């Protein structure tokens, strides 16, 4: 029997995360018109998982599911040589272009903002290339201005939402002395002041109890952002762009989230080539696609991780939200696993790779038995034991 993990081995408790607690999270592509959103989405769509891999899901034309590349998964497949290989995926939604005044319904404003509310994170595409053939909605290329336009629209929509919430709470407080109503009202006032000060919700210093309430609101500025700076192929190849320093300075002043420079023109060219020709082109020009990096960064940004189940029949990534405990992780495989959870037998990927086999991991005392309070970590390799009424153990 594997040793039980001691309390000192447990990961330190984390503050709750802003956002939905689900293993089915998605990221949306956001930006002004003509910045490269749809081109980026079309490139990603070429890499998307065939619909038949999800027989019980209808994938909308503006949605794509793409494999998350991972050398650890590849290594496990080489080790076990399974009959079936199932990697993790990222769901990406293409969202219509925003225009100034969207919060008040301009353009496709209300639909646009409701689509952002439905996703869990944002790929914010910025135009950092000049092209007379591609018009800009504001008649000039200025990525920092574009950043401020979208930031303001999202904050204004959040202010509108929070003000409506305040109004509703005040009506309810007249009819009830419920302390929870008062707490929510105080929080809403703080959030409104925070937004009116030009700050996004995700950068607020919120208590755990605040976050639990905020997560019921699905505020637009609570969602994590990855900035994708779309430049010309020439600028991308020479790794130099006149707009990039100003973009970097702005992002550092506004939360310091991840910036990934890329080129839709280059990625589209590469996507249209046969794989061997694309590899040769990249080698000759000392350049590489950043689409894999974008996918992995987006996956992590919305707080998704995955654990592995591994054996000769199947190696599979089971994606879960960070901070998920073992019984809930087991439930992603089957509800019976969660309902009748006994324990999780856990190997760390690094231990398996270092030692070379499950038997060696067990011999080294690194094959652990974890209970209901164990928080699953990224790349854990897990075998669940469960027992349900009328059933047996797995």
From Swiss-Prot:
Locate the OBG-type G domain: which residues? 25-282
Subcellular location per the Swiss-Prot or TrEMBL entry: Cytoplasm; Cell membrane; Cytoplasm, Cytosol
Specify which residues bind GTP according to the UniProt entry for this protein: 129, 263-265
Q: Which residues bind Mg(2+)?
A: 38, 58
- What InterPro entries does this protein's entry cite? ATPase_YchF/OLA1, Beta-grasp_dom_sf, G_OBG, GTP-bd, P-loop_NTPase, TGS, TGS-like, TGS-like_dom_sf
* Means of activity regulation: Activated by GAP1.
Single Gene Ontology MF annotation: ATP binding
Kindly list the biological process annotations in GO that this record carries. negative regulation of defense response to bacterium; negative regulation of response to salt stress; response to salt stress
Superkingdom per UniProt: Eukaryota
GO CC annotation terms, alphabetical: cytosol; plasma membrane
Cite the NCBIfam families for this sequence.
Answer: redox-regulated ATPase YchF
Q: Which family does it belong to?
A: Belongs to the TRAFAC class OBG-HflX-like GTPase superfamily. OBG GTPase family. YchF/OLA1 subfamily.
- What is the recorded name of this protein? Obg-like ATPase 1
């Amino acid at each position: 029997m594997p040793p039980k993990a001691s309390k000192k081995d447990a990961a330190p408790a984390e503050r709750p995360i802003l956002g939905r607690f689900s293993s089915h999270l998605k990221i949306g592509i956001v930006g002004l018109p003509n910045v490269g959103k749809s081109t980026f989405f079309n490139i990603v769509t070429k890499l998307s998982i065939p619909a038949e891999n999800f027989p019980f899901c209808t994938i909308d034309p503006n949605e794509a599911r793409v494999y998350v590349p991972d050398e650890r998964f590849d290594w496990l497949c080489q080790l076990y040589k399974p009959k079936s290989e199932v990697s993790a995926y990222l769901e990406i939604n293409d969202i219509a272009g925003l225009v100034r005044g969207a919060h008040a319904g301009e353009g496709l404003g209300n639909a646009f903002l409701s689509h952002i509310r439905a996703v869990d994170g944002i790929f914010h595409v910025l135009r950092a290339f000049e092209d007379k053939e591609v018009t800009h909605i504001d008649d000039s290329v200025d990525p920092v201005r574009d950043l401020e336009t979208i930031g303001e629209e999202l904050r204004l929509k959040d202010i509108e939402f929070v003000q409506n919430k305040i109004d509703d709470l005040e009506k309810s407080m007249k009819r009830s002395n419920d302390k929870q109503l008062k707490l929510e009202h105080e929080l809403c006032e703080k959030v409104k002041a925070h937004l009116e000060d030009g700050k996004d919700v995700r950068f607020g210093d919120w208590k755990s109890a605040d976050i639990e309430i905020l997560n019921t609101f699905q505020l637009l500025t609570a969602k994590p952002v990855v900035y994708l700076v779309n430049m010309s192929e020439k600028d991308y190849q020479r790794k130099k762009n006149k707009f990039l320093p100003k973009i970097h300075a702005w992002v550092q002043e506004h939360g310091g989230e991840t910036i990934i420079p890329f080129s839709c023109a280059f990625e589209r060219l590469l996507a249209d080539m046969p794989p061997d020709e694309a590899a040769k082109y990249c080698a000759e020009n000392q350049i590489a696609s950043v689409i894999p990096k974008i996918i992995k960064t987006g996956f992590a940004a919305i707080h998704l991780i995955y654990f592995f189940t591994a054996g000769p029949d199947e190696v599979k990534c089971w994606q879960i939200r960070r901070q998920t405990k073992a019984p809930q992780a087991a439930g992603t495989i089957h509800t019976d696993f969660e309902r009748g959870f006994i324990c999780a037998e856990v190997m760390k990927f690094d231990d398996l790779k270092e030692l070379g086999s499950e038997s060696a991991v067990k011999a080294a005392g690194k094959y652990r038995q974890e209970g209901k309070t164990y928080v699953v970590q990224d790349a854990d390799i897990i075998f669940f034991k469960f027992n349900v009424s009328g059933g047996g153990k797995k």
